[in-house]
A protein has these predicted regions:
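Long, low-complexity intrinsically disordered regions
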Residues: 1-288, 293-373
Length: 373
């Protein structure tokens, strides 16, 4: 192992890798690729997560990237909706599919889904979507018309899309452009000519692990497991995938904790100086979703409930020095910052400058209002 590192170094390095310090100049797909996907069940938050990392951006640029096939939208990590790049997205989907969560007895008991039903559902969905863009109701109607699948109508109508997620992970469907307020589905090759397909898991693992550690390292296997699937993939399987990287991953000591990083990043991390940069990040931002809100170096344990709310809601956050020091909300023309009182005096000048940057991104006048929480 190399010399010990500090958590302020690690957090500053992550800020740099995640295009937050300094702000980057990459394309929209390159931001998504660097972050290993962007959580997207709240479309405005997803676009803002990308725009705050780009020195120059435009409203609607995510929608344009989707329309042009430079991004796809589908259920991915932790079963949640994400923006992915079509060239690489199939790699993470492959690992999720490898978990075979839908084959668990609990799925059969709850949904009445046997292996025979799954074997019939996949081709039914692919056939229904071949050359077509269908709303959920149109897709369900096509599926339940098939022999032996009529009982799935209610489950397929679930707002969470539980039965459709395994199909997304196997590359059978992804989201298409909305039709009014209704979602649509299509085949990934139709969504993007850049679609790279769902790789074999062993090949996919090397791609995804390298990408994850390039943005969220140093980290552990458990960090990766939680980010990918909330623990639904076995540690044994993950260890096999990790071992395939050989000496590409190396162990480092961060204030007494043993974690891993890509070998090519070790010297850069060791040379990184702590940062004092202040950033406002939107809800569900990858800065906290990547390591998880239970990473006490990013979100102090006593403040986890301020960030991670009921029903899976993740608050907009104020990051200073690489850790979460507050939350914020937009109230009319006011950006109301709730600065954690234990973090010391609020950096008012830095907060004002960051709100001015937000005002430029959103093309509106904003002012900062700082309070203690």
């Amino acid at each position: 192992m190399s010399a010990a590192l500090s958590w302020p170094q690690v957090l500053a390095w992550r800020m740099r890798r995640q295009l937050l310090d300094p702000i980057g100049t990459p394309s929209v797909p390159d931001v998504v690729r660097r972050l290993c996907g962007v959580q997207a069940q709240v479309a405005s938050s997803a676009e803002l997560a990308i725009r705050v990392r780009r020195g120059s951006s435009q409203r609607g640029e995510v929608a344009r990237a989707l329309a042009e096939g430079r991004l796809i939208k589908t259920w991915a990590m932790r079963g949640t909706l994400h923006l992915l790049t079509p060239e690489d997205g199939g790699a993470v989907l492959s690992l999720l599919a490898a978990g075979r969560s839908w084959e668990r007895p609990s799925w059969e008991r709850y949904f009445g889904m046997t292996t025979k039903h799954w074997d019939a559902l996949r081709p039914a969905v692919r056939d229904a979507l071949e050359g077509k863009l269908l709303t959920r109701e149109e897709l369900i109607a096509a599926v339940v018309a098939q022999r032996g699948l009529g009982h799935l109508g209610e489950a397929l109508r679930s707002g969470w899309g539980t039965l459709l997620k395994p199909l997304a992970w196997q590359g059978d469907l992804c989201f298409g452009p909305s039709r009014g307020n209704r979602v649509t589905f299509m085949r990934p090759p139709a969504a993007s000519s850049r679609w790279g397909g769902v790789l074999e898991p062993d090949d996919a693992a090397r791609i995804v692990i390298v990408a994850y550690f390039g943005a969220y390292g140093p980290a552990t296997i458990e960090n990766f497991r939680s980010w990918l699937s909330r623990g639904r993939i076995s540690v044994r399987q993950l260890r096999t995938w990790f071992s395939s990287l050989g000496d590409r991953l190396v162990e480092v000591d961060v204030e007494g904790r043993r974690v891993h990083i890509l070998a090519e990043h070790r010297d850069e991390l060791a040379a990184t100086k702590p940062t004092r940069t202040v950033r406002l990040l939107p809800g569900f931002d990858q800065y906290v979703m990547g390591p998880g809100t239970d990473d006490g170096h990013v979100v102090a344990a006593k403040r986890r409930t301020s960030v991670s709310k009921q029903s899976g809601w993740i608050s907009p956050i104020v990051v200073a020095g690489g850790s979460v020091k507050g939350t914020w909300e937009l109230d009319g023309d006011d950006v109301r910052v709730a600065w954690f009182k234990e973090a010391g005096p609020p950096p008012r000048s830095a907060l004002k400058a960051e709100v001015e940057r937000f005002a430029s991104i959103l093309d509106r006048d904003l002012r900062v209002v700082v309070g203690l929480a």
